[in-house]
Amino acid sequence: MFNIVKKEIQWGEETLTLETGRVARQADGSVIATLGETSVMANVTFAKSPKPGMDFFPLTVHYQEKYYAAGKVPGGFFKREARPTEKETLTARLIDRPIRPLFVPGFKNETLVMCTVLSHDLVNDPDMVAMIAASAALTISGAPFRGPIAGCRVGFEDGEYILNPEIDDMHDLRNNPEQRLDLVVAGTKDAVMMVESEAYELTEAEMLGAVKFAHDSIQPVIDLIIDLAEDAAKEPFDFQAPDYSELFEAVKAAGEDKMREAYAITDKLERQAAVSAVKEGVKEGLSEEQLEDPNLSAALKKLESTVLRSDVVKNGRRIDGRALDEVRDIVSETKVLPRTHGSALFTRGETQGLVVTTLGTGDDEQFIDALHGNFKSNFLLHYNFPPYSVGEAGRVGPPGRREIGHGKLAWRALQAVLPAATDFPYTVRVVSEITESNGSSSMASVCGGSLSMMDAGVPLKAPVAGVAMGLVLEDDGSYGILTDILGDEDHLGDMDFKVAGTEAGITSLQMDIKVAGITQEIMEKALEQAKAGRLHILAEMAKAVTEAGEFSEHAPRIETMQIPTDKIREVIGSGGKVIREIVEVSGAKVDINDEGIIKIASPNGDSIQKAYDMIHSIVAEPEEGKIYKGKVVKIVDFGAFVNFFGKRDGLVHVSQIKNERLNHPSDVLSEGQEVWVKLLGFDDRGKVRLAMKMVNQETGEEGAAE
């Protein structure tokens, strides 16, 4: 009934297994990949013919983490998996980026890759297992896929690269100073296709070494997928890349010179209008048959690419006339919004970001319910890309995959320089509103985010800047590396290489390669050129701000205090009664954790002090021999009970009230009367013993009144 094919190798410290033929047999390709006890099922299906009029490749990658994989029940009202989490969206993009360029050009059949996490051992992150499973499923599916690829994660600790570090070591690098890198690399047998990383000011050489280590480490996995395919692959789908060479020559003859003139226009919107006019002019000179050719749009795009690429490689000339290593003009401004906690407007050429920082308290932390546990994040970065930023009227709604991915890239770049939570107990939310875009808006978010946080008073370890690099690589091996690429250079080039960091080193690196043949020499040169660009941008940013400014008067102030853990119950009170009273009386927000760390937040310093004093009076212990002011709360035959230390009561025995004999305490005391008392000590049962007779009741000083 089943035709099961199973292959396995020892990979790092775990066994990697690939299995097909047992489940999802109606899919074009189905593979379950298992690393340790983490298992991911990848299923591939593709249409056998394209939809009419389709002018792009409709590839969809889905990644879903099932809660049952870790023995958990989903939260929420419906108790089932719903919309994709940020992790699921980012992982889907992580898988999509290296496989998309490897489909045969011209293939426009609808293709679906679905990755489902079936089991999670809480040690091995399922994202890389999913990438391997997806690659294996594509390889055996018969789809025109020029893989396989494989991926791995690399850490960097004590100068050593670590293959597939445990998930607990990687999910919060800011609080794990020994681990300085979280790098994901995907590639084929011969080339690196994709890099994604979060780093702690690593040098260019260290980053390049990590990429090489990763590419070497995935070779056994690629061999394993090939071994599986030799026994389980389906017949290749009969698809030939369309030959539109004659059509392209006709398009080139009709429009190359005019297209070159159009691409000499520096203004983006004018250039786009001119390019559109050239395309329409080309179409007017084509035959009816050529106009109906489904490859016409591809031929026109190839004409654009040819013009741009030849100018870069042969003439060293770019669309806007810049040198290959030249950064566009930069204007950095801070304090652009009066009521926000911190704001910056970062403009680089025709790319602009309005970035705003808001400071919050512990109540504002983001709660994350992940397969490997629940945790909180006190740094949030949200990236918004409205249609008007590119002069279009389009969809407005919740963030898409691209916005989530760009936001996470900027988050990785900036979180490495944030102060420790113990030194800066605030929740920081950064929002990047892209108001203009012509390439590298995510890096504008990094620069603007750094400026905005410093404007808000966040004591960053160092300013951070980012730059997007591009590459044009010709068949003869000649190439040009571009600094600070425009949107057209991104779309028509062979590599998108984003690097962010401080003067000391790299904090984030993202690379997407569309072609094979990117050598280590090219990558090394690109990183060095990116460093020069980054340092230039940092110098321009320094004209606006170089260090954390003063807090906005509208931002909350937070004071922290540590109390003994056995006092937490007293501060909270029965049903939260005490802490609610503190909040109501003081007007401050009060947050307490299981370690006894209390955060008191308010824009008003007096509110913070009042809450601090109230908490201190609850948790502090009265000192023997000290004098305190108190209030008589109850009179009995043998003395008086005095409330003298917050809510603490003690007994003043009748013999300790005055230096003379009293018939009854009520002879000299009444309930509600304020008195001065001295703490004599505690009896065997811990009861407080107080005295009045040795304290001057007028001055509160030691020594009875005459």
Curated annotation (Swiss-Prot):
Positions contributing to Mg(2+) binding: D490, D496
Domain spans labelled KH: 556-615
Catalytic activity: RNA(n+1) + phosphate = RNA(n) + a ribonucleoside 5'-diphosphate
Stretches that traverse the bilayer: none
Disulfide bonds: none
Domain S1 motif: 625-693
Superkingdom, taxonomy of origin: Bacteria
SUPFAM superfamilies recorded: Eukaryotic type KH-domain (KH-domain type I), Nucleic acid-binding proteins, Polynucleotide phosphorylase/guanosine pentaphosphate synthase (PNPase/GPSI), domain 3, Ribonuclease PH domain 2-like, Ribosomal protein S5 domain 2-like
GO cellular component: cytosol
Gene3D superfamilies, alphabetized: GHMP Kinase, N-terminal domain (3.30.230.70), K Homology domain, type 1 (3.30.1370.10), Nucleic acid-binding proteins (2.40.50.140)
Biological process (GO), any one: mRNA catabolic process
Location within or outside the cell: Cytoplasm
Pfam families reported for this sequence: KH_1 (PF00013), PNPase (PF03726), RNase_PH (PF01138), RNase_PH_C (PF03725), S1 (PF00575)
Primary location class: cytoplasm
Cofactor(s) in the UniProt record: Mg(2+)
UniProt keyword terms in alphabetical order: Cytoplasm, Magnesium, Metal-binding, Nucleotidyltransferase, RNA-binding, Transferase
Catalytic activity, EC: 2.7.7.8
SMART domains, A to Z: KH, S1
GO molecular function: 3'-5'-RNA exonuclease activity; magnesium ion binding; polyribonucleotide nucleotidyltransferase activity; RNA binding
Summary of the function given for this chain in its UniProt record: Involved in mRNA degradation. Catalyzes the phosphorolysis of single-stranded polyribonucleotides processively in the 3'- to 5'-direction.
PANTHER family, per the entry: POLYRIBONUCLEOTIDE NUCLEOTIDYLTRANSFERASE, POLYRIBONUCLEOTIDE NUCLEOTIDYLTRANSFERASE 1, MITOCHONDRIAL
Family label: Belongs to the polyribonucleotide nucleotidyltransferase family.
Protein name: Polyribonucleotide nucleotidyltransferase
Native organism: Jannaschia sp. (strain CCS1)
Source species taxonomy: Bacteria, Pseudomonadati, Pseudomonadota, Alphaproteobacteria, Rhodobacterales
